[in-house]
Amino acid sequence: EKLPYVKSCGVNYLHFMPLLESPKGRDDGGYAVADFRKVKPELGTMEDLEDLTAECHRQGISCCLDFVMNHTSEDHEWARAARNGDPVARSRYFFYDDWFVPNIYEETVPEVFPTTAPGNFTWINDCNQVVMTTFYPYQWDLNYANPMVFNDMVGNMLYMANRGIDVIRLDAVPYIWKQIGTNCRNLPQVHTLVRMMRIISEIVCPGVLLLGEV
């Protein structure tokens, strides 16, 4: 019911910060997504979001949503299955039996939060393995060298477009490709993946804009 007032202020673009389901206390402000198809219960439902975007459009207001690409919450169904030993689920992330490969990465990859979350990997006691966690230990990096990851994340992106989101802001997109011996930032493969996403969106939802965080 506040949209007419927002419109009267001259607003024609609303940027929604992360609002998808994420675990309380381990949500990084919503950037640790546990379910890409559900809204945080305290904010409402996906149907509420559809109603909101529809009303925004009636008011001439475009809607932008942060879409977290680099990682999922450790509570995501893929991560839970990986923790339980599912090899297919583990292939969606970066799992290692020991610290040998992670330590090679650490030689060239800078820390995002050196004080609050030092390092880029976390030991998972439940499965006695190391997983890549560039941001926080509860945010597991996705492996975009696995085609399933790209396909499913594009599916999640298109799902949000079908909910009425006009602009998809690709959060942490420079981090999505990992390669030993590099800083794992803004590598050429990142640009290739984003171009592929752009091609797909131009075919399926040409009115949707992709906005990359750089």
PLM regions: where:
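Acidic/aromatic-lined carbohydrate-recognition and catalytic surfaces
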Residues: 1-151, 162, 173-214
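Receiver (REC) domain switch/active-site residues of two-component response regulators
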Residues: 166
